[in-house]
Amino acid sequence: MAVIAMTREMATRGSEVAAGIAERLGLAIIHHEIVEHDIAERTGMPESEVHRYLEGEASLLERWTLDRKRKSRYTAQEILELAARGNLMIRGWGAAYLLKSIPHVVCVRICAPMPFREKVLMERLGLEDAAKARREIERNDAAHNGTMQRLFGIDWEDPSHYSIVLNTARIPVVDCVEQIVRLTESPAFGESTQSRSTLMEQLVLARVRFAMDQRFGPKSLQNGFEVHVFSGKVLLTGATIDEQMIADAVRLLQGVEGVTGVESKVSHVAFVPHAN
């Protein structure tokens, strides 16, 4: 089942490319609102707060109260959960970056030069001022690049994150669709037992990290425990002064979907108070 992750610049006709691919291949298109809803549901945060954070609109105080690593893990888990369903296209929120190591996922970036984008936006919104269109495009680009930098520390314009980069100023929408459809049909992007295993291993790791966050808070992964997943088997390493936490973590992770076994190599370090 085809899985496509697409990133598109504003006013590049990327939505037309996405619609054309979905129609040709019978794919569901997953928009960012669905990802936001799922993250809000898992974290207990209001959807409006999740949206503001992902759009780069949160205030400085709000950003202090939001753990970047935890939000990036929640985003990663939602994207991986969606990809595991198959037969869909995921647009935005770092899906192309998060899924680029999955062999059967086609990661696409749609872009175009600024003059082309200005013209598209002016026609779409009925604008007569090119400068106004440019400002809106630049604001949108900055917000999206800021989100990728904040969550994953990457430049979304880096072509190495994608299977294919298409410039719609030079390549018509219909030809973009054809190029991407051909990639999904190529043996290089065929789903195999190995590629499915790679996806599931990353998904189980994301589920495990989420479970640890929910049960013990971010300190479990930031200060003490490290989590590794190999073919569904979880290995805990690290050190902690909390011996009960080790036993609790093993029991917790045994119940995580996709986990087939848990081994702990976490060292218990006795707490020795400093002498006065």
Predicted regions and their residues:
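Long, charge-dense
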Residues: 28, 35-52, 113-122, 126-143
